[in-house]
């Protein structure tokens, strides 16, 4: 951890900072990072360029989330994000936002076409079902992700025009999450072999008909335990659904 932070400090321009992504469901790592060992807040206190935390792989209960946000703020980590993948989880983040107002937090809504750990609900469905509730919170920043791999698709969400397909008015988000596409960028330290494999993996064509009767019309699933288009859907060490390259 210390070695990677030192390397990060060498790479970042002066004044640039990063957010630390932590998996809430991985209790060993969570306790190491923010529990009894507190290696992340301690590293921040020593001057590391970390100014926020992304809480992924689960949403804490309300009381725990409020205490966490207050603790992180006190530790000099003002930017706190939660990454829900279901309607219920988004509404939990809304409750958290109301409880900590006027502190601003971020909700990173991630749909079922995201790489790695993923939801079984489509991004558009998640946004359409909760948009009004999220926007009713002045202290909640809305970010969307999962299957956004091109500038044009990102622009649809930033402008809000993604909602037109459902007969809805513009529903713009404040930002987008880019994961898999960023891994293939020239600047990424991903190994060349992995980059090539990502590029060559065909995936599921956007006009393909899904065999999964539960798949939303706007989404393209790889059914659990199966492989489609060079991608497989399995379970991670957290017993959570995860997409992986078939290699």
Predicted regions mapped to residue ranges:
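Active-site entrance/lid segments in N-terminal catalytic domains of soluble metabolic enzymes
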Residues: 1-137
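An acidic- and aromatic-residue-enriched active-site/binding cleft used to recognize and process polar
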Residues: 85, 112, 147-148, 180-181
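Gly/Ser-rich catalytic serine loop of serine hydrolases
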Residues: 116, 144-152
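Conserved active-site-proximal phosphate/metal-binding subdomains
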Residues: 134, 141, 153, 158-247
């Amino acid at each position: 951890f210390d070695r990677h932070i030192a390397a990060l400090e060498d790479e970042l321009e002066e004044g640039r900072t990063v957010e630390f992504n932590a998996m809430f469901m991985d209790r060993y790592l969570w306790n190491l990072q923010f529990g009894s060992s507190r290696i992340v807040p301690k590293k921040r206190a020593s001057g590391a360029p970390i100014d926020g935390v992304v809480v992924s792989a689960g949403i804490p209960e309300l009381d725990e989330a409020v205490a966490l946000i207050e603790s992180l703020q006190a530790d000099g980590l003002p930017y706190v994000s939660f990454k829900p993948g279901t309607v219920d989880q988004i509404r939990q983040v809304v409750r958290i936002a109301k409880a900590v107002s006027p502190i601003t937090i971020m909700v990173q809504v991630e749909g079922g076409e995201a790489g790695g750990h993923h939801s079984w609900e489509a991004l558009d469905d998640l946004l359409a079902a909760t948009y009004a509730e999220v926007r009713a919170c002045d202290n909640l920043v809305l970010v969307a992700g999962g299957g956004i791999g091109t500038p044009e698709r990102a622009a649809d969400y930033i402008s809000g025009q993604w909602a037109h397909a459902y007969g809805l008015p513009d529903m713009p988000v404040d930002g987008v999450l880019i994961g898999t596409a960023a891994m293939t960028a020239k600047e990424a330290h991903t190994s060349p072999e992995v980059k090539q494999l990502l590029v060559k993996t065909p995936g599921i064509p956007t006009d393909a008909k899904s065999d999964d009767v539960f798949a939303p019309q706007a989404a393209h699933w790889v059914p659990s335990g199966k492989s489609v288009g060079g991608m497989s859907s399995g379970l991670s060490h957290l017993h959570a659904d995860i997409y992986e390259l078939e290699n």
